[in-house]
Amino acid sequence: MSSDLPNTIVNRTTVTSPDRGEEIPMDVLAAAQPAKLYILIGTNALVQPGNDDSFLAYYAKMLDDLRMTLPNTVFYVQSVLPATQAEIADSLPGLAPDRLAVINAAIQQLCTERGCCYLDLNAEFADDAGCLQSEFAQPDGVHLTVSGYSKWVSYLCTHVPYDKDNPYQAGSTYYLSDDMKNLLSDIP
């Protein structure tokens, strides 16, 4: 299921899944009733400069609708990732660091007001100028490389509240520390 616009969820828009055909994202989530839901949404909606107030209003409504539909779910809302400096200048002005800082601060406030956990991916992925570090970016300047995805997974595993049911989280007997990962990677 792919939907990068909060209004797709709020307006119950049908999306096409390659595996399941047409579906409405909110209905899929309601049927699944997940214990946890990780949300990373907004990059495509923000590519071009536009009405930030409208985007944030839909984001707030999306979180409210999700909370009502999934009352027992823990929500982990991730910040909107930046693009590389070259891509922002060439074709993605809407992902400028100053704009994303305002958007992400507003999303963080929405999370605080609604009891959602906010995860600041930019702290890990942005350079000093607030742009996506090129070492983690595909040539398009937006999508992550394999090392970027690995860093993302590691961040998620180490930046959520401890949960005994999550075996890959720090504190779990199954979690591999960086020292252990390095030791295992040296084995032929």
Located regions from the model:
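Conserved SGNH/GDSL esterase-like catalytic core that processes O-acyl groups on lipids
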Residues: 1-60
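Low-complexity, flexible helical/coil segments
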Residues: 4-6, 71-77, 112, 152-159
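Short, flexible active-site loop motifs that bind/organize anionic cofactors or intermediates
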Residues: 27, 65, 139
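N-terminal cationic-hydrophobic initiation segments that often serve targeting/anchoring roles
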Residues: 29, 66-68, 108-111
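Loop/turn elements at helix/coil->beta-strand transitions in domains of secreted/extracellular proteins
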Residues: 32-37, 70-75, 113-117
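Active-site segments of SGNH/GDSL-like serine hydrolases
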Residues: 38-46, 64-101, 123
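Generic structural signal for well-ordered alpha-helices
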Residues: 59-64, 104
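Catalytic His-Asp segment of secreted/periplasmic serine-dependent ester chemistry enzymes
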Residues: 82-188
